[in-house]
C-alpha cells in the first residue's frame, strides 16, 4: 500500500516563478513538437493554452531550440508520447539548453511522458532536473480513467480556483507516479496527492 505516493497530475511543475509577469505582458509558451510527442497531446495542449488570454503559444522543434528560440519564451511544455524517443530527439546539447532555461527562472511543464523526462529516475532516459523520481515503472501500462486528486497547501496557492474543493478530478492515462528522489538534492514540492479510483487495468500496488 503506497498511501503516501505523490502524483503530480501527469505534470511536473518546474520554475513557475517566472510565470508571474508584469501587467500587460503575456506568458510566451513553447510546446515541443518533436519525435516521440503524441500529436493529440500536442493539439490538446495548444488548445488549452489558447483559452487563456494572458498566454501565447507556439510549437518548437529541436532545430528551434538549437537556434535559440528559448530566449523568446517564458515557459516550455514537453507533451505526452514516448519519453525515451523525445529524449533521443532532443539530444544532450538541447537538454542542457533547457536546463539553463530553467536555471534562469523560466517555467517548464512535462505532461505524462514529458513528466517522466524531467525526473531523476534510475535506469530511465531522463533529464534529472525536478527532484522527483518515477516509481512502479515496470507497470507503465497501469490504466486510465477519471481519477481524483486533492491539492496540498502549496497546490492551492498555484491553483486558487480549486482551493476550496476537497477533491478535484482529472482524466488520468498511464502517467508517472512520483516520489521525492533520494539521489539528487533538488527542492521538491508536492502540489497534489493522487486518490486512486476505479480505472481500467489499474495496478493494485498503487491503491
Briefly describe each language-model feature range.
Residues 119-169:
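Class I SAM-dependent methyltransferase SAM-binding "motif I" and its flanking Rossmann-like core
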Residues 1-5:
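Positively charged n-region of N-terminal signal peptides that target proteins for export
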Residues 21-26:
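Cleaved targeting-peptide boundary
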Residues 37-122:
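Helical hinge/lid and interdomain linker segments adjacent to catalytic or ligand-binding clefts
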Residues 147-207:
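Catalytic beta-strand/loop cores that center a nucleophilic Ser/Cys/Thr
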Residues 11-19:
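Hydrophobic h-region of N-terminal signal peptides that target proteins for export
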Amino acid at each position: 500500500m503506497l498511501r503516501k505516493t505523490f502524483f503530480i497530475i501527469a505534470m511536473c511543475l518546474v520554475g513557475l516563478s517566472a510565470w508571474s509577469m508584469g501587467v500587460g505582458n503575456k506568458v510566451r509558451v513553447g510546446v515541443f513538437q518533436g519525435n516521440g510527442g503524441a500529436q493529440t497531446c500536442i493539439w490538446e495542449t495548444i488548445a488549452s493554452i489558447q483559452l487563456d488570454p494572458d498566454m501565447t503559444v507556439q510549437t518548437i522543434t529541436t532545430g528551434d531550440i538549437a537556434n535559440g528560440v528559448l530566449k523568446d519564451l517564458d515557459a516550455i511544455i514537453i507533451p505526452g508520447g514516448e519519453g525515451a524517443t523525445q529524449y533521443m530527439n532532443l539530444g544532450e546539447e538541447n537538454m542542457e539548453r533547457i536546463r539553463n532555461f530553467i536555471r534562469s527562472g523560466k517555467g517548464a511543464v512535462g505532461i505524462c511522458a514529458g513528466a517522466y523526462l524531467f525526473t531523476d529516475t534510475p535506469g530511465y532516459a531522463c533529464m534529472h532536473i525536478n527532484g522527483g523520481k518515477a516509481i512502479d515503472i515496470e507497470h507503465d501500462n497501469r490504466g486510465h480513467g477519471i481519477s481524483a486528486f486533492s491539492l496540498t497547501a502549496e497546490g492551492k496557492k498555484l491553483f486558487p480556483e480549486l482551493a476550496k474543493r476537497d477533491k478535484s478530478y482529472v482524466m488520468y492515462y498511464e502517467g508517472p507516479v512520483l516520489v521525492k528522489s533520494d539521489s539528487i538534492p533538488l527542492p521538491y514540492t508536492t502540489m497534489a496527492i493522487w486518490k486512486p479510483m476505479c480505472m481500467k487495468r489499474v495496478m493494485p500496488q498503487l491503491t
